[in-house]
Amino acid sequence: MPFQFTGFADEAEKTLAGQISTLKEVGWSAIELRLIDGKNVCDQTPEEWEQTFGTLQGEGIQVVGFGGQIGNWARPVTTDFQVDLDEIRRVAPRMRQANCKFLRIMSYPNDADSPLSQEAWKTEVVKRLKELCVIAEGEGIVLAHENCNGYGDNPEGYLELVEEVGSTALQLIMDTGNNSLHDNDIEVTWRYYEICREQITHVHVKCAKPGPDGGDHVTCHVDEDPVQERIFKHLEATGYDGWLSIEPHIKAAIHAGKDVDDSGEGRTVWVEFARRLESLVSKI
């Protein structure tokens, strides 16, 4: 099996202990951190982080990535940039401590209420990413841009950013479901993947299929979305041996304010998603 497995276990359990036990239930020993007890790991106090890291070390759990908030769906291009500068400076030392290189970012959605022109939007995004990349290079971390909200939500936009920013610290997280859900078409995801394959440093696994009424696409399991197997086969054929990090969004979707509840259903779905992913990949 060429790939390694991890995931956002905050979609299974709220507490760190619960997230760790979920990982162990599926036999995994690595996590991509985001929410712990409802708080983003990047916002933890020094004391909270030391407790988090100590627990992870004690349980033998590797930290693969930090699910950061820089440039994300809640921080449009008009947001005070100091918020993002504070985040990267706060979290970079913690990433080094955890021997973790991936800080997930996005690329600043335009302001819905007072949108900038296309050119002004691009200029401001590039300016911000350049400054963030200088910091990232100095800290030895990767700003892993997810194909989600922002200027780089399409392949052409992302490649424009790569060219303009000109930093090895800016690399791509390919989420295998975001574009399908945004555009109600799995072929849009394949197109993003195909155009940007050489940029990919990390993979988030999310899946989509048409809704029961034939309307908007909804999240689903990997074996219900044919673009997943196509992507995994091509990744293997082209030498990718990194992480597949699951972010099912079936029972929890952080961006939509849909946090995991206490029913246990989120964990059940997460575990099933993990096992069905392993089963699919084992047949490639």
Each model region followed by its residue ranges:
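Short beta-strand segments at enzyme active-site cores
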Residues: 32-33, 64-68, 101-108, 143-147, ...
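Glycine-rich, proline-tolerant flexible connector loops at the mouths of alpha/beta enzymes
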Residues: 32-57, 108-113, 117
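N-terminal small/glycine-rich loop or linker at the start of catalytic domains
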Residues: 1-6, 64-75, 107-112
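Active-site acidic/histidine proton-transfer and metal-coordination neighborhood
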Residues: 13-21, 58, 74-172, 181, ...
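Histidine-acidic metal/acid-base catalytic patches
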Residues: 1-9, 13-29, 53, 85, ...
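Feature marks short, surface-exposed loop/turn motifs that line or immediately flank catalytic pockets
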Residues: 37-39, 70-74, 109-111, 151, ...
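Acidic/polar N-terminal loop/beta-strand segments that form early-domain functional surfaces
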Residues: 8-10, 34-36, 68-69
